């Protein structure tokens, strides 16, 4: 894992098309902004895991979500 230090307002680049900017820090929360092409999905990890689980689980999981 690459570990980088950035201050509020500073940006890091991932490849040529994705930028991540630190927008603010309040306590133990960090607000970041991500600029990426529309064909690149950007999700919080817990949302990504839920999407992946729903895709793997198939239609039977849909009834449990309501």
Curated annotation (Swiss-Prot):
Originating organism: Alkalilimnicola ehrlichii (strain ATCC BAA-1101 / DSM 17681 / MLHE-1)
Keyword Nucleus: no
GO MF, any single term: mRNA 5'-UTR binding
Signal peptide: none
Disulfide bonds: none
GO biological process per UniProt: mRNA catabolic process; negative regulation of translational initiation; positive regulation of translational initiation; regulation of carbohydrate metabolic process
Function summary: A key translational regulator that binds mRNA to regulate translation initiation and/or mRNA stability. Mediates global changes in gene expression, shifting from rapid growth to stress survival by linking envelope stress, the stringent response and the catabolite repression systems. Usually binds in the 5'-UTR; binding at or near the Shine-Dalgarno sequence prevents ribosome-binding, repressing translation, binding elsewhere in the 5'-UTR can activate translation and/or stabilize the mRNA. Its function is antagonized by small RNA(s).
Chief localization: cytoplasm
Name of the protein: Translational regulator CsrA
PANTHER family to which the protein is assigned, alphabetical: CARBON STORAGE REGULATOR
Keywords: Activator, Cytoplasm, Repressor, RNA-binding, Translation regulation
Compartments reported by the entry: Cytoplasm
Pfam families registered for this protein in UniProt: CsrA
Family, per entry: Belongs to the CsrA/RsmA family.
